[in-house]
């Protein structure tokens, strides 16, 4: 999956991934292989994407959160060590290919100590296949551009965030 490698390399060169941060990943493996979101799913594609992200994690120290599909209310699979009980609520569900999606399922099975949380608020994310990760990204979302527009057949959208600017005409920001 050369597009994914190129995408991740470009993001690393832009310092997109930071140690001790969480990046949410949404992915439709169906879309990657050219099918309608939620229709087919591919554990092979999920494995390739997960393994590529694991390499990034090892290189940069970033953690990844894997958004499930709408059938589990887009709940997010994370490592227990990333869980913050003050800002996250654990839920009882195990992602499955048909209720959670292939990537969240693969991640749950291959993470060290996975848990699923209802919602997170993280500074950045990568959406492969228009899975609607925006609900998990801090305000204010800012698009990130790379040369890679698709992974396989899936459209890729990347976002980071910035603090809100408040105050009005008298406020100073710099």
Curated annotation (Swiss-Prot):
InterPro entries xrefs: Antibiotic_NAT-like, DUF436
Top-level lineage group: Bacteria
NCBIfam families per UniProt: TIGR01440 family protein
Protein family membership: Belongs to the UPF0340 family.
The name this protein goes by in its record: UPF0340 protein SH0921
Organism this protein belongs to: Staphylococcus haemolyticus (strain JCSC1435)
């Amino acid at each position: 999956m050369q597009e994914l490698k190129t995408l991740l390399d470009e993001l690393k060169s832009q310092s997109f991934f930071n140690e001790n941060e969480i990046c949410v990943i949404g992915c439709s493996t169906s879309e990657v292989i050219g099918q309608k979101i939620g229709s087919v799913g591919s554990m092979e594609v999920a494995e390739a994407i997960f393994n590529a992200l694991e390499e990034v994690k090892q290189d940069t120290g970033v953690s990844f959160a894997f958004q499930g599909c709408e059938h589990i209310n887009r709940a997010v699979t994370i490592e227990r060590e990333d869980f913050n009980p003050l800002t996250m609520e654990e839920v009882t569900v195990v992602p499955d290919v048909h209720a959670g999606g292939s990537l969240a399922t693969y991640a749950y099975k291959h993470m060290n100590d996975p848990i699923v949380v209802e919602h997170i608020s993280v500074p950045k994310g990568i959406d492969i296949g228009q899975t609607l990760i925006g609900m998990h990204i801090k305000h204010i979302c800012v698009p990130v551009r790379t040369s890679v527009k698709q992974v396989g057949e899936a459209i890729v959208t990347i976002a980071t965030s910035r603090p809100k600017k408040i105050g009005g005409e008298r406020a100073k920001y710099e």
